[in-house]
């Protein structure tokens, strides 16, 4: 495809910590967090003027889904904007509790596992051509997804070692560090379920666009990333592989014998050299599989050209990330890739305090890395110190908080803003815009995710502004 729509859905962890008194339950904290959302949108599931969706997911997890983005720059900016929007709700709740004299601190975490072992996700969405043979795409994509965590994993401390396969309890071995948070909680390669079986790819066919032309690839195996550059590499590298598959490029069959088991193997092997069993009886390492894809993608780009100006950046960081693992030199990427940024921070703290990874303080710092608070979060502390790289500017993120990208999201965002300004009841989803007037209803279907204008929607927006609804 010459153009693609991207989106990221992020579930956040929420907790109220009150060492000197009773803490709010998860349900109470979530209910109070979303009180301003309910007041604004009359529901806890709303679309915002920037085109994104904000809602409470299963288990009292705040979730933000970015607006449809058509560029790597925009999807990274929208993801960062979502974190800022949800953290603003956290800040408002903290102020409210402080004013009421309720002791304690509200924490919002952009991570994937809580202290009880419950997992929550970060889902990536890629629009693909309906004509793409889906089974072929899955065959090439799964080995890539299993092994890309050596680049884009968020990193995780295991104070008592890795958990046993299929177990929620901590391990009973030596303390260790893994590439991925999510890997220990994925059970199969692909499925139409997301919560029961936790697959790597959700195969339920919900395109949120013209189903004759498009399909939505829903990837749910990735970690939530604090680093913008890690997010950009995650989306950018996956997009390049998809382009190559869609173009009919012939790739070797690297079907894994057991993708879920391989996912764990890769996560807990920081050398990238564990042998992964393939379905044909042979084996490959994560480094070998990633190098194979990178080399094929590089040749593809050389033949067909780069489809956006950040492709060289993606390829360079991809290669450097693999070199960092191969050479066991995380300093090559400890400003750009989450697992390496976090590891550098933890290693320095442990060395200066005479600790190892089994110490509870290291697990606390692991969690604090993902705290979204600009003042308390460790990643944001590194950001303020200039210790990590960015992919978009703070101004880009601020703009994305209130403004939709140049896609269908721009139409939706303008419609939502106009309906709220006119105080007119309305219903919105990814495709439909509906005015629920006192005497009549008007509905528009926006099936083209790239369209920034549509006559019937423009008419509704004009009528809302004129008070003619």
UniProtKB/Swiss-Prot annotation:
A Gene Ontology biological process term: modification-dependent protein catabolic process
Keywords recorded for this protein, A-Z: ATP-binding, Ligase, Magnesium, Metal-binding, Nucleotide-binding, Ubl conjugation pathway
UniProt-annotated catalytic positions: 57
Enzyme Commission designation: 6.3.1.19
Transmembrane regions: none
Keyword Ubl conjugation found: no
Catalytic activity, as annotated: ATP + [prokaryotic ubiquitin-like protein]-L-glutamate + [protein]-L-lysine = ADP + phosphate + N(6)-([prokaryotic ubiquitin-like protein]-gamma-L-glutamyl)-[protein]-L-lysine
Ligand binding (Mg(2+)): 9, 55, 63
Family membership: Belongs to the Pup ligase/Pup deamidase family. Pup-conjugating enzyme subfamily.
Biological role: Catalyzes the covalent attachment of the prokaryotic ubiquitin-like protein modifier Pup to the proteasomal substrate proteins, thereby targeting them for proteasomal degradation. This tagging system is termed pupylation. The ligation reaction involves the side-chain carboxylate of the C-terminal glutamate of Pup and the side-chain amino group of a substrate lysine.
Note: The reaction mechanism probably proceeds via the activation of Pup by phosphorylation of its C-terminal glutamate, which is then subject to nucleophilic attack by the substrate lysine, resulting in an isopeptide bond and the release of phosphate as a good leaving group.
Protein name: Pup--protein ligase
Organism (species): Kocuria rhizophila (strain ATCC 9341 / DSM 348 / NBRC 103217 / DC2201)
Gene name as annotated: pafA
